[in-house]
Every structure is written in structure tokens, then in C-alpha cells.
């Protein structure tokens, strides 16, 4: 089922025998672009940050959160919405059957390895096979997601950095090797509508800016571990000496140490290069749930947090 000017429209049975490219063309161009609908999946804070961006730009969305999502049990033994998702409670469904508007785009903002993303993506695309999949590729590639799905779904990757989206004006996109240019163009349109300028890059783990930034943060963490300087001095040196907008350790806290660790683990697994080996401080801090600003503590201590 697709939408035509906001109304459900059933395709004739024979349409499902058309090539994927033609079906995608029909799905996209029978839609009024102003009514493009997005289904956000997963209960992480990254989902909440993208929801804020979509809401602020008046783009309709629904959040699908399964009852067995780990984030539902992060604050007790009974399932409950994490605090950061409470403002969007009216947009959250816990059953695919409750998604009233078939989405044009399924958006997964979580910086997880592909094998951790795929079960939820599978569950959703079985119900909405015409949707384009827009997937965070901080810890995987779009082609890897397409490989796991084992179908001709169009998968586009993007470099969504939590804690960075509010001020960011550019976002990186990557196309799975088998995905269509049509799908990429559609995603560019939607990202432009949310205030982003898009840069299309090769489909690699971490893309460009997130990958380089994570590597720099890792080096800063090693400098702390080796007592080369205090964390304050390291951050001050990068802000005043290199003119970075934030110190690297402060920046890591803002993005989330768990996110940085996820990127570094994925880069090290992909390339086996020493420069991507995560500093043990990242792993130890994440084990202690010191994930940065979101948790109230990371390299620095903060007044509030919800992790």
C-alpha cells in the first residue's frame, strides 16, 4: 500500500511483478512530497534527536518501538518509555499494525553493528516493502545492511551524529552498491527539507567526518591515559591551537562515548589498523555507563543525564 495525496492507495496485483526500480519510482512519484512520511525505528536517544529535527521542520513521523527493546528496560524491570522519548509518546507505536500511514522512508538512527540492526529492520520491511531504508552507517555500511536483508531493498546510509545534529548543517549520505540513484535522490530531498545540505560519499564504515572525528577523539583519550596532559589542557589545546569548535574530549562526551566506541570498534573490525583500536578508557567508561552528557558523566561530570 502506498499513499496518494495522503490517502491509502492499493496497487493492482500485477504491479508487484514489476522490477524493484519501477515499483520504487511508482511509490515515490505517486506521493505528494510535502506529505512524505517517515518511520523511525528503535528506542535510543539518537531516535529522539532525529525526531526533534523532523518535528521542528514539520515532517510527519512515527516511532516504532518494540516491547523487547533494551531501552524500554533501561530504568527498571518493567517496560517504560525512556525519558528522552516521553515528549514523543503520542507518536510512538509498539506494534507495526498500529502504523496508520505507510512510510516512504524507514529511518534507523542507531549507531549499531549491522547484525544488531537487521532484526528490527526485517520486521518493518516485511510490512512496508516499498519503503526506502535510511540507516546510520557510523558502525556499518549500507551495503552490509543490504547484504543481511538479502533482498533488492534500497538502502541509503547517513552519518547521523547524536549531540551534533542541532548545529549541523551538512550530513553525509552513502548509497549501498546495489541501491538506485532514485532512492538516493529521494533521501536528498528529504534531508534538504530538514535543513541539511547533503554530501554524497563512498559507502564506508563511519563515512568521512564521523570517522576522522572518532579517530581524533581516540588519540585524545590515549593522551589522557598516558598522562601526557590533563583533559582540560588537551581540550584547550585543540580549541585554541587548532580552532576546533569543541575540545575533543568534551565533544566525545556530547556525541556519547558509547557512540564513539561503537564507531571505533566497527572501524577496527573492518580495517584491522592500529589507529582504530579503541582506547581502554572508552570501554571502561561505557561499562560504567559513563557515556558522557547523556549519562551525567564521561570525561567530565554534568549536572543532569538520563542513562
Name each model feature, range by range.
Residues 3-6, 13-14, 18-19, 24-94, ...:
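NAD(P)+-binding Rossmann beta1-loop-alpha1 motif at the extreme N-terminus of oxidoreductases
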Residues 79-132:
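Rossmann-like NAD(P)-binding element
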Residues 2-3, 220:
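Conserved binding/recognition cores within well-folded domains
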Residues 32, 48, 110, 118-122, ...:
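Rossmann-fold dinucleotide-binding core
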Residues 180, 229-233:
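Helix N-cap / loop-to-helix initiation motif
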Amino acid at each position: 500500500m502506498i499513499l496518494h495525496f495522503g490517502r491509502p492507495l492499493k496497487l493492482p496485483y500485477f504491479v508487484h511483478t514489476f522490477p524493484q526500480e519501477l515499483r520504487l519510482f511508482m511509490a515515490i512519484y505517486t506521493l505528494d512530497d510535502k506529505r512524505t512520511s517517515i518511520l523511525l525505528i528503535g528506542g535510543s536517544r539518537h531516535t529522539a534527536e532525529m525526531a526533534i529535527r523532523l518535528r521542528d521542520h514539520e515532517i510527519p513521523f512515527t516511532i516504532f518501538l518494540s516491547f523487547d527493546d533494551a531501552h524500554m528496560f533501561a530504568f527498571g524491570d518493567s517496560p517504560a518509555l525512556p525519558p528522552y522519548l516521553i515528549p514523543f509518546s503520542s507518536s510512538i507505536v509498539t506494534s507495526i499494525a498500529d502504523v496508520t500511514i505507510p512510510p516512504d522512508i524507514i529511518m534507523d538512527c542507531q549507531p549499531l553493528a549491522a547484525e544488531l540492526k537487521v532484526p528490527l529492520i526485517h520486521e518493518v520491511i516485511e510490512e512496508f516493502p516499498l519503503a526506502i531504508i535510511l540507516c546510520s552507517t557510523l558502525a556499518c555500511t549500507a551495503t552490509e545492511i543490504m547484504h543481511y536483508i538479502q533482498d533488492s531493498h534500497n538502502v541509503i546510509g547517513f552519518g547521523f551524529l547524536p549531540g551534533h545534529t542541532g548545529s549541523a548543517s551538512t550530513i553525509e549520505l552513502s548509497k549501498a552498491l546495489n541501491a538506485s540513484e532514485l532512492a538516493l535522490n529521494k533521501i536528498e530531498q528529504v534531508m534538504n527539507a530538514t535543513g541539511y545540505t547533503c554530501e554524497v560519499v563512498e559507502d564506508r564504515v563511519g563515512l568521512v567526518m564521523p570517522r576522522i572525528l572518532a579517530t581524533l577523539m581516540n588519540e585524545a583519550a590515549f593522551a589522557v591515559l598516558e598522562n601526557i596532559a590533563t583533559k582540560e589542557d588537551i581540550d584547550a589545546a585543540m580549541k585554541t591551537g587548532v580552532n576546533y569548535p569543541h575540545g575533543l574530549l568534551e565533544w566525545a562526551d556530547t556525541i556519547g562515548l558509547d557512540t564513539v566506541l561503537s564507531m571505533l570498534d566497527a572501524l577496527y573490525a573492518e580495517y584491522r589498523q592500529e589507529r582504530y583500536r579503541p582506547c581502554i578508557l572508552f570501554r571502561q567508561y561505557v561499562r560504567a555507563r559513563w557515556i558522557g552528557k547523556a549519562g551525567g558523566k564521561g570525561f567530565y561530570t554534568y549536572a543532569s543525564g538520563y542513562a
